[in-house]
């Protein structure tokens, strides 16, 4: 079961990815984690990636694809994998296909931008424990304070409204075209494409995913 999750940041992919991993026993492959692991392990590809990153440059698509290919050949991917945050662009999707990385399911999480902004900008975090609150959807007992320790809650740098809006613009320019790309792939019988309304309750989205994935 090889799955790609598509959707803007804050569309709820992370929550559902956790559920899919646990239910179906497949690992989530995040390109960021994968790059860090390869650099730490000192593999040939990891050394190349480190050189590029140390120079302050972006790692090339070719190198990321090679890392993905190496990663999915590992034992824990025998039953499949879940790709998170990759591919981000059509050239990356094409490159994946060219090296024989096929996917069974592409699931798009559809959520309007304004709701995403609402979701992300309202987040508050207790840095020491990682506990996450939301001023509207999951408020702490005392405003601005962690329920357990009473310590101050903070706003992550990425959760400021101007940053979120920039990320959404980037998503619509770069990643949204993958929606029509994978719809065409599904029409050609190369994958199965599903659109999930991410505005609903977590449990409702989860139930739909179970129906889709079986």
Swiss-Prot record:
It is found in: Cytoplasm. Coiled coil: none annotated. Its EC number is 2.7.4.3. AMP binds at residues 31, 36, 57-59, 85-88, 92, 156, 167. Residues 30-59 are annotated as: NMP. Transmembrane segments: none annotated. The keyword Disulfide bond does not apply. Residues 122-159 are annotated as: LID. One of its GO terms (cellular component) is cytoplasm. ATP binds at residues 10-15, 123, 132-133, 200. Its main location: cytoplasm. GO terms for biological process: AMP salvage. The keyword ATP-binding applies. It is an enzyme of class 2 (transferase). Pathway: Purine metabolism; AMP biosynthesis via salvage pathway; AMP from ADP: step 1/1. Gene3D superfamilies: P-loop containing nucleotide triphosphate hydrolases. Keywords: ATP-binding, Cytoplasm, Kinase, Nucleotide biosynthesis, Nucleotide-binding, Transferase. It catalyses: AMP + ATP = 2 ADP. Monomer. Catalyzes the reversible transfer of the terminal phosphate group between ATP and AMP. Plays an important role in cellular energy homeostasis and in adenine nucleotide metabolism. Consists of three domains, a large central CORE domain and two small peripheral domains, NMPbind and LID, which undergo movements during catalysis. The LID domain closes over the site of phosphoryl transfer upon ATP binding. Assembling and dissambling the active center during each catalytic cycle provides an effective means to prevent ATP hydrolysis. Belongs to the adenylate kinase family. This is Adenylate kinase. It comes from Pectobacterium carotovorum subsp. carotovorum (strain PC1).
